[in-house]
A protein has these predicted regions:
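Macrodomain-like recognition of ADP-ribose-binding/processing modules
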Residues: 2-296
């Protein structure tokens, strides 16, 4: 499966490879005289055969030049293709740089990230009950794993310590107290995030893409307040069982969610100042590839 993904990504990059190859070959053709290509006579026997077929209008020297130029083109294409295959096979991270930000997207486990502030996404009510019911935190989720490794966490106490005011609007789930999606509550070096709105059954559902993006923009504003001159690590928010859209919504691929996260961060006036980095930690998945991200 990995080999097929690499080949598919290579096919999609073939246009870019062609541009690179044509650029290199054009430079060589511009500065290297034809006489150099004429001196390479490996094709003399073929040249003589072609001249015999087509007559004396073509010289052996001219045919040698044509073949040697084609050989150069093939060699350069081969080198660039092999280089891309190696890159696509072993890529583990992609860095995106702007005038005022650095984003690193990489495979990994956010709970193993070090030397940074980790953003751990909860729902809008900061639910801490772990289980398999729709309204409970799943043990396999990042939030579930975090709660299991921090069994004594006192989220109400953390909320009280920063004098955080609940949102005026109650949650759709049992009319519980909720916090604005994108709100951060510090827990030591970790940043607990109120994120997914809950529906009547307690499942995470963003009613629309707009609400999802609004939550991201508010998150960037909150990070500006709490990142404390450190790198910040986030997961691909909403990539678990959270849905986006009208009604029950639909599951969105990691790739699409990542695109929205990156674009919203680029557009936000609130960013983590250089040289510090926003790290986006991704899990390896069949519908996701770092090769689809344009580094710059």
């Amino acid at each position: 499966m990995h080999i097929l993904k690499v080949l598919w990504d290579l096919i999609k990059r073939s246009q870019k490879i062609a541009v690179w190859v044509l650029s290199v070959v054009s430079v060589v053709f511009t500065f290297v005289p034809e006489s150099v290509f004429a001196t390479i006579k490996k094709w003399s026997f073929i040249s003589q055969y072609i001249v015999g077929l087509l007559g004396d209008n073509l010289s052996i020297e001219n045919i040698n030049i044509i073949f040697n130029r084609l050989l150069l083109f093939a060699v350069v294409w081969f080198i660039f293709t092999v280089g891309q295959i190696v890159k696509l096979s072993f890529i583990k991270s992609v860095t995106i740089k702007g005038d005022d930000f650095i984003v690193e997207v990489k495979y990994g486990d956010i709970l193993k990230e070090a030397d940074c502030r980790r953003v751990i996404a909860f729902d809008e009510c900061f639910t801490t009950v772990i289980g398999n019911a729709p309204n409970e935190i799943k043990t396999s989720s990042i939030c579930g794993q975090y709660l299991q490794s921090n069994p004594d966490i006192d989220i109400p106490g953390l909320i009280s310590s920063i004098h955080l005011t609940p949102d005026k609007r109650k949650s759709r789930y049992k009319h519980n107290i909720r916090y604005k999606s994108g709100t951060i509550v510090p827990n030591g070096n970790d940043l607990l995030l109120a994120f997914a709105p809950l529906d009547e059954t307690g499942r995470g559902v963003f009613p629309s893409y707009k609400e999802y993006l609004d939550s991201l923009f508010y998150l960037w504003k909150e990070l500006d307040k709490y990142y404390a001159q450190q790198d910040v690590s986030i997961s691909i928010l909403g990539s678990g069982i959270t849905r986006i859209g009208d009604g029950m919504g639909s599951f969105i691929s990691q790739q699409k969610l990542l695109d929205m996260i990156i674009e919203s961060y680029k557009l936000s006036p609130y960013k983590i100042k250089k040289p510090h980095t926003l790290r986006i930690i991704c899990r390896k998945d069949n519908d996701f590839s770092l090769n689809k991200i344009e580094a710059c």
